[in-house]
Design a protein with these regions (language model features):
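Alpha-helical transmembrane segments of multi-pass integral membrane proteins
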Residues: 47-54, 114, 140
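C-terminal membrane-cytosol helix-exit motif in multi-pass small-molecule transporters
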Residues: 6-23, 219-220
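Alpha-helical segments in transporter systems
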Residues: 49-58, 179, 183
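Conserved extracellular-gate-facing transmembrane-helix segments in secondary transporters
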Residues: 54-65, 152, 187
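Residues at helix-coil transition
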Residues: 17, 42-43, 61, 73
């Protein structure tokens, strides 16, 4: 109910926003426009890195969400109420960073924020999986999820704002379309994560996702 009310509120706010008319940058065949957007991304390594980073975040990094019920039940022995609090810790961290970015405007050193945030998110994800398995501390799990929320929002907000500012108006819709498509990969990432969890356990499967995100940020 609360989630539904939140979406209705957001819809009402969006409906009240008035923006000036902008001429469409793409006309004609949608498939051709899609290919043009892909070709534009391929011409710039920075755009490849930024879109690739969002892919790794959605497919590997955020796969931990699908494994959280297993962590809560088997590793932390939590009930529904404690599980809800655990999940909200990451949201609080993300919200805090979003508010800070809102007041900070356009921060410098976005490259450092992107790479550093992704690496630290990956490390935090590995730490969360390992400590849940080896220690089983509820308080520590909350703290690590809060930290993960801080870092993931740090680099994802930096990626989104960088794309918005760097891509010209004529291509922005198509490039941001690919950015949005990467978020749709999150449910697909749950499938290999679940398969890996069967083989090595959910905590270690979560750690593998964190390693993948950090490795891409450092090696790409």
């Amino acid at each position: 109910f609360v989630a539904g009310a939140g979406f209705l509120t957001m819809a009402a706010v969006m409906y009240g926003i008035r923006v000036p008319h902008i001429e469409p940058g793409a006309t004609g065949n949608p498939a051709r426009n899609l290919l043009e957007g892909l070709d534009y991304i391929r011409t710039n390594f920075l755009f490849i890195f930024l879109i690739g980073m969002t892919f790794f975040n959605s497919f590997f990094g955020m796969a931990y969400v699908s494994l959280m019920p297993v962590i809560a039940k088997d590793a932390l022995s939590l009930g529904p109420g404690a599980y809800g609090i655990l999940l909200s810790a990451g949201g609080v961290g993300s919200l805090l960073v979003t508010v800070v970015f809102g007041f900070a405007g356009n921060p410098q050193y976005k490259g450092l924020l992107i790479i550093g945030g992704a690496v630290l998110f990956g490390i935090s994800l590995v730490a969360f999986g390992l400590t849940a398995e080896l220690i089983g501390s509820y308080g520590l799990a909350i703290a690590l999820l809060f930290i993960m929320g801080l870092f993931t929002s740090t680099y994802m907000i930096s990626i989104q704002s960088s794309l918005q500012m760097m891509v010209p108006d004529s291509m922005r819709g198509r490039v941001m379309g690919f950015y949005g498509m990467t978020w749709s990969l999150m449910p697909l990432g749950a499938m290999p994560a679940a398969g890996l969890a069967v083989l090595i356990g959910a905590p270690f499967a979560i750690g593998v996702g964190g390693i993948a995100v950090a490795a891409f940020a450092l090696l790409a």
